Amino acid sequence: MPDSSINSDSGFKHLSVMEDAVSQPVAALPAELLVGGLIIDATLGGGGHSALLLERHPDLRLIGLDQDPTARAAAAERLALFGDRVTIVATNFVDFSPAEPAVVVMADLGVSSPQLDVAQRGFSFRLDGPLDMRMNPQVGETAAELIGRLEETELADLIYAYGEERLSRRIARRIKHDLAEQGPYAGTAALAYAVAGCYPPKARHGRIHPATRTFQALRIAVNNELDALDRFLQKAPDWLVPGGLLAVISFHSLEDRRVKTAFLRDQRLERLTRKPLVASEMEIAANPRSRSAKCRFARRLPQATTADAL
């Protein structure tokens, strides 16, 4: 259902990544698809990619999905000039089914800058805040509750699997010891300090913070991100008209491998990018968070059904 909880005073400022990389394949679509066609932005965020496409293609319409109320408010403000061409839906993309097929389905899987930069969201180890990490702050288990519930071996396995962290067992041991001795961590800074202490002193001050992989793992687990991505990749091809475009921007190898495999093996899709597109040096200089972005495209084949998928 359309979102009725939007408040335009959002304070949500986000710089979208790889806008040109997304817009160019859309511009190359057949003209008949672009006339009156529908875009489904599965991760609307602040609405940057969608605003660009709506501006460049006046006949396109948009359905934007996001489970974060702050993001929806920002997108509503940014996209207001497009009027009834825009519908914003308060949902996770795994729970959505469109009433009509789209010419473009896109998903930007990254955590937005406002989510990272607001301490209260609990995503960042650089800003002290509660250990939350939920994309939808009204639903589900927090990171603090997760690390309290898991056994040490389960926590170690999670940090290794979702963070690709080689010191996962040492980190899990430290976390569970701290919780037993001191009670819950005061916030993200305390957890980051504990994780950094598991590294040798010389490894604590590199370009990548020692807590990066552990925080990634906890965020993925809290939001069930990889399972949600797998379900999206299964459903999204059926949201498209024949010849429609599926675009996915990922930010770490666990996501990109899934997208690559789905685009290669799904018989409903024709892979358009053998290797992912990456941000230019100019964009990285302007927006350092684009450094890890990878964008892949696929086209919906005609007369393919869900049975043709993996």
Swiss-Prot record:
<dbReference type="GO" id="GO:0005737">
    <property type="term" value="C:cytoplasm"/>
</dbReference>
<keyword id="KW-0698">rRNA processing</keyword>
<protein>
    <recommendedName>
        <fullName>Ribosomal RNA small subunit methyltransferase H</fullName>
        <ecNumber>2.1.1.199</ecNumber>
    </recommendedName>
</protein>
<dbReference type="InterPro" id="IPR023397">
    <property type="entry name" value="SAM-dep_MeTrfase_MraW_recog"/>
</dbReference>
<keyword id="KW-0808">Transferase</keyword>
<keyword id="KW-0963">Cytoplasm</keyword>
<feature type="binding site">
    <location>
        <begin position="47"/>
        <end position="49"/>
    </location>
    <ligand>
        <name>S-adenosyl-L-methionine</name>
    </ligand>
</feature>
<dbReference type="Pfam" id="PF01795">
    <property type="entry name" value="Methyltransf_5"/>
</dbReference>
<feature type="binding site">
    <location>
        <position position="93"/>
    </location>
    <ligand>
        <name>S-adenosyl-L-methionine</name>
    </ligand>
</feature>
<dbReference type="GO" id="GO:0071424">
    <property type="term" value="F:rRNA (cytosine-N4-)-methyltransferase activity"/>
</dbReference>
<keyword id="KW-0489">Methyltransferase</keyword>
<dbReference type="GO" id="GO:0070475">
    <property type="term" value="P:rRNA base methylation"/>
</dbReference>
<keyword id="KW-0949">S-adenosyl-L-methionine</keyword>
<dbReference type="InterPro" id="IPR002903">
    <property type="entry name" value="RsmH"/>
</dbReference>
<comment type="similarity">
    <text>Belongs to the methyltransferase superfamily. RsmH family.</text>
</comment>
<feature type="binding site">
    <location>
        <position position="66"/>
    </location>
    <ligand>
        <name>S-adenosyl-L-methionine</name>
    </ligand>
</feature>
<dbReference type="InterPro" id="IPR029063">
    <property type="entry name" value="SAM-dependent_MTases_sf"/>
</dbReference>
<feature type="binding site">
    <location>
        <position position="108"/>
    </location>
    <ligand>
        <name>S-adenosyl-L-methionine</name>
    </ligand>
</feature>
<feature type="binding site">
    <location>
        <position position="115"/>
    </location>
    <ligand>
        <name>S-adenosyl-L-methionine</name>
    </ligand>
</feature>
<comment type="function">
    <text>Specifically methylates the N4 position of cytidine in position 1402 (C1402) of 16S rRNA.</text>
</comment>
